Amino acid sequence: MANNDQKRDEGYIEKLVQVNRVAKTVKGGRIFTFTALTVVGDGKGRVGFGRGKSREVPAAIQKAMEAARRNMIQVDLKGTTLQYATKAAHGASKVYMQPASEGTGIIAGGAMRAVLEVAGVQNVLAKCYGSTNPVNVVYATFKGLKAMQSPESIAAKRGKSVEEIF
């Protein structure tokens, strides 16, 4: 597979996850359009995904990249891994992600790997169950990452210290 990640001048890492051709049948024949799914991140915990549609592939990718930049979230990482094991689902896709020790690398497949790479996660064990549709896997991965909170943020919300929580 080609290396689909690029670094832009803003410091974002961009990855193309999927390009899909869709055909609409009309009286005169078929009209082909393309949809692109991309993920964008800064490698330090900020990550976003976007979808773009157009009659040409480059235009669809460009629209998806712009949508991904507008749709960015901040993920609370614990160094180069996740805070704790988490599960999430979207549609028939279910994902499970758990932190891993230093040197493990990203053990994840397909669309989930792209999201974790651009987010800056370097050590993680992840598995996708059910449907492996890239769109649903990306949505589910984002749900899991978005729901994850650091002990510091939980302590701040409760008005306690981190030691009091544990």
Curated annotation (Swiss-Prot):
Keyword DNA damage attributed: no
GO BP: translation
Alphabetized UniProt keyword annotations: Ribonucleoprotein, Ribosomal protein, RNA-binding, rRNA-binding
Entries under Pfam families matching the protein: Ribosomal_S5, Ribosomal_S5_C
GO molecular function: rRNA binding; structural constituent of ribosome
S5 DRBM domain boundaries: 12-75
RNA-binding in keyword set: yes
GO cellular component, one term: small ribosomal subunit
Disulfide bonding pattern of the chain: none
Record NCBIfam families: rpsE_bact
Subunit structure: Part of the 30S ribosomal subunit. Contacts proteins S4 and S8.
Summary of the function given for this chain in its UniProt record: With S4 and S12 plays an important role in translational accuracy. Located at the back of the 30S subunit body where it stabilizes the conformation of the head with respect to the body.
Family: Belongs to the universal ribosomal protein uS5 family.
UniProt comment concerning the protein's domains: The N-terminal domain interacts with the head of the 30S subunit; the C-terminal domain interacts with the body and contacts protein S4. The interaction surface between S4 and S5 is involved in control of translational fidelity.
HAMAP family reported for this sequence: Ribosomal_uS5_B
Protein name: Small ribosomal subunit protein uS5
Provenance organism: Pseudomonas putida (strain ATCC 47054 / DSM 6125 / CFBP 8728 / NCIMB 11950 / KT2440)
Source taxonomy: Bacteria, Pseudomonadati, Pseudomonadota, Gammaproteobacteria, Pseudomonadales
Encoding gene per record: rpsE
